[in-house]
Amino acid sequence: MSSRLEREAARRRTFAIISHPDAGKTTLTEKLLLFGGAIQMAGSVKARKAARHATSDWMAMERERGISVTTSVMQFPYRDRVVNLLDTPGHQDFSEDTYRVLTAVDSALVVIDAAKGVEAQTRKLMDVCRMRATPVMTFVNKMDREALHPLDVMADIEQHLQIECAPMTWPIGMGSSFKGTYDLLHKQLHLFSATHGGRIQSGIVIHGADDPQLDEYLGDQAEQLRMDLALLEEAGTPFDEERYLKGELTPVFFGSAINNFGVREMLDMFVEFAPGPQPRPAATRVVEPGEEAFTGVVFKIQANMDKAHRDRMAFLRICSGTFTRGMRLKHHRTGKDVTVANATIFMAQDRTGVEEAFPGDIIGIPNHGTIKIGDTFTESKEVLKFVGIPNFAPEHFRRVRLKNPLKAKQLQKGLEQLAEEGAVQLFRPLVNNDYILGAVGVLQFDVIVARLADEYGVDAVYEGVSTHTARWVYCEDKKIFADFQDYHRGELAVDAEGALAYLAPNPWRLESAMERYPKVEFRTTREIS
């Protein structure tokens, strides 16, 4: 391993932001870019109005290009680290993509609205983090508004996200009486000031809770803070780096993203403690980030919504080695060698051609329909297939009906290609010729119907279907499996890759099937082959 590769890989921090819509994720993302991008590049913080104007111009330009990849991946420098931030879309475009983003990162940041606590979408995404033992940090946002008590917020996180909380900062008051936060690690007081654009005044060093300066700055609230600190000292969970890296414990920060408050402490701790690029399991072995030979895996495909250009962008996570412009790579699923001349890297404020990139970086490769999610690219001829990019059991189902029967072939082609892209899952029942679509979010069905019309000239509609949930089924005992398939034939289907799935009409039917056939596995995820 070259010392440069080792050095560059060690600088990378690749993470995703997880939150429920309206918890302030977009605002926090902008503030992270402000601390990491604008401050580094401009040397000063622009007025917020001007910054907002610049951002909106930038987005308009993106719209003209017809593809909004900038919201998906952003890279920015911070304190000699290179941070790759992956956005998980909000509920409007919630899809399996959101889950798969979490397979491309080494850690995650959960944003929680202090007034609402943990919400449904956050739970689903945390399930994926838990499955992969992903280290998670938590930012409790909107402390400048009326909120739940911080102990209640942490209890909510521990109960619903099944992870222990270690507070790193502690809020002093909330809403109109919000005075700031106390940094438990460095024993510093950060005073909140909604004036000056809410920028942090330098931390005031306090020598423990008995320091008389505490009363000077906080007045009546000093005593409450002392009581809180005594309680945390006695009953709180201290930060443990090892447990954080195992995904067992989350450091918790309190603040107000819109006022830039509490963001810097979290970002400082993030670049210090979050893991760099991690080893990646392949079917035959584990690939270490420091290996000289380049390897990468595609975790997302974004369609170009510009109808004039059918191109798609494949998002590839670099797992090892150095990527350089124009290098020849082996595309393992097709067995072909390809030259990657015009890959893209996504900087905080623009997209640029990649000259070189390192483990942990995300690059975009133009794709004319030949690249699929889960595809592996390598520099060497070694046969390699990265694992761990799953399909998730859909939660919503619709049947697709064709208005013009003569377009059956185009419908099949369109649905197969869209399923390949990961936009939706396609199931073909064993007992009829229906096309059943399964999706994580209902909006995906509208997207599919619109794209069938636009891109494939197919006029189709979708309608309800009596499927409640899907499970991929597997059994080592062939006799039991054959009996199961005979008994449930009317509820079985194959997906786009030929895997057998049980489409349960209701929860009771699924429960009954699982009780009747205990040796059959009913899986909620399936590895993409």
From Swiss-Prot:
Keywords: Cytoplasm, GTP-binding, Nucleotide-binding, Protein biosynthesis. GTP binds at residues 19-26, 87-91, 141-144. Its main location: cytoplasm. The keyword tRNA-binding does not apply. Pfam families: EF-G_D2, GTP_EFTU, RF3_C. GO terms for cellular component: cytosol. Residues 10-278 form the tr-type G domain. This is Peptide chain release factor 3.
